[in-house]
Amino acid sequence: MSTTVRPDEVSSILRKQLAGFESEAEVYDVGTVLQVGDGIARVYGLSLVAAGELLEFPNKVMGMALNLEEDNVGCVLFGESNTVKEGDTVRRTNILASVPVGEAMLGRVVTPLGEPIDGKGSIETEIRVPLERRAPGVIFRKSVHEPLQTGLKAIDSMIPIGRGQRELIIGDRQTGKTAVAIDTIINQKGKGVFCIYVAIGLKGSTVAQVVNTLEKYGAMEYTTVISATASDPAPLQFIAPFAGAALGEYFRDTGRHALVVYDDLSKQAVAYRQLSLLLRRPPGREAYPGDVFYLHSRLLERAAKITDDIEVARKMNDLPDALKPLVKGGGSLTALPVIETQAGDVSAYIPTNVISITDGQIFLESNLFNSGQRPAINVGISVSRVGGAAQIKAMKKVAGTLRLDLAQFRELEAFSKFGSDLDKTTKAQLDRGARLVEILKQGQYIPMPVEKQVAIIFLGTQGLLDAVEVPHIRRFEEEFLSMLEHKHPEILKTIAEKGTLEADTAKQLKEAAERFVSSFNQKVKA
């Protein structure tokens, strides 16, 4: 006998099954890979994609939309392009390229997309901000007025840097550009400045060496290293500086001070040129695309000193929603971009672009470096256009004539090579100049506190070192500063606290120096 199903049973079974039915389908905007190669993919579809949006390719390879054309989208790939093939499906993520920001990033080595590569576990941050952001408008800025001490005598005395400034470090390869930047980062210890070191197109071993140096000198606790090495895809080298700027802006907008080093922007320009040519954008001078100036200007304009008025700061343009509740006034972001020149040619395309964007440049020369003057700064063509307003009064007072004295010394030195009979004044000037050059020399990774710099430069410019033989200047400096620290700490303390060199302090310093010079000379002769 066949079992019959009653109609009411059928309806109850259907009801049961329909009750568990999920009607929501996941909707994705997808496209198809038409062509792939050299880290570039052409994708058909994705008609609603935004420029700079992240795209998901198979095998978890991420990409970014750069060229939005009528019939296809030109994407750059952040992973291995050999895992992507023609006909693959590409998904939109509806997320613009962004980077995680926060205190958790300090002490870590990350990729330009914020993924840790130091083996210390994942990074827990609540806030992500877009890589690209418009620079603060004029109304939200304040003029640069606080010093950012580098700890290098030649820079802090003649090419002072202020918080919120953009100062270019330019020179040939192997002239100590990275060393100047690393010394500056080490010198920020205990000064409340958060540092970001962006390595673009450097060797992996060089980045590891930088990280080891920062750890050795205790600088890693307030520093983040963003690494896009030479072996990383060109798109990562292109976005790395923007990731550094975004992280620096987080500290700037929350009322703190940050320093970002871009090492170096020449390699970012090369990576951008590579992407642009592969995307078939028209080439310009030196085959760089027409917007390579805009590439660097929009990056470096993000370094700024923000107004102290918190109400005005809260209205800042392009502020990410996640940052709005945290905004405070008075923060700053200082940028130290690095540019590598070829055979000292500062009139090439990229160097001239960046010189015109920044607020001054520190020019390093290979012949000075090879002659033993380190840091190898050519003070003749190095300038700081806004740093003078940030220099402490004591330094301004003692180093006022330093640049002129050195310029005259260089000129006289060139002429003295032709003639042997020099009058007394010329000889005295040459002797003084040789001593000034000697006191500006400094070892690597030993930045000097500003009060000690003021003391030793005061001795040099006042002629108190004229009695010390040139070969003994470095030893004299070391022993004199050690003596000041132990026997006259009040002199250094007064300079550090007041930021000025009062007449009585100068008198004390002069007397202490005169006594020490005579005892030092006796010791040397003995």
From Swiss-Prot:
Residue(s) at site: Required for activity: S382
Compartmental location: Cell inner membrane
Species of origin: Chlorobium limicola (strain DSM 245 / NBRC 103803 / 6330)
Family as reported in the entry's similarity comment: Belongs to the ATPase alpha/beta chains family.
Quaternary assembly: F-type ATPases have 2 components, CF(1) - the catalytic core - and CF(0) - the membrane proton channel. CF(1) has five subunits: alpha(3), beta(3), gamma(1), delta(1), epsilon(1). CF(0) has four main subunits: a, b, b' and c.
Gene that encodes the chain: atpA
Function field: Produces ATP from ADP in the presence of a proton gradient across the membrane. The alpha chain is a regulatory subunit.
Signal sequence bounds: none
Recorded catalytic activity of this chain's protein: ATP + H2O + 4 H(+)(in) = ADP + phosphate + 5 H(+)(out)
UniProt-recorded name of the protein: ATP synthase subunit alpha
Pfam families: ATP-synt_ab, ATP-synt_ab_C, ATP-synt_ab_N
GO MF annotation terms: ADP binding; ATP binding; proton-transporting ATP synthase activity, rotational mechanism
Membrane topology: Peripheral membrane protein
EC number(s) per entry: 7.1.2.2
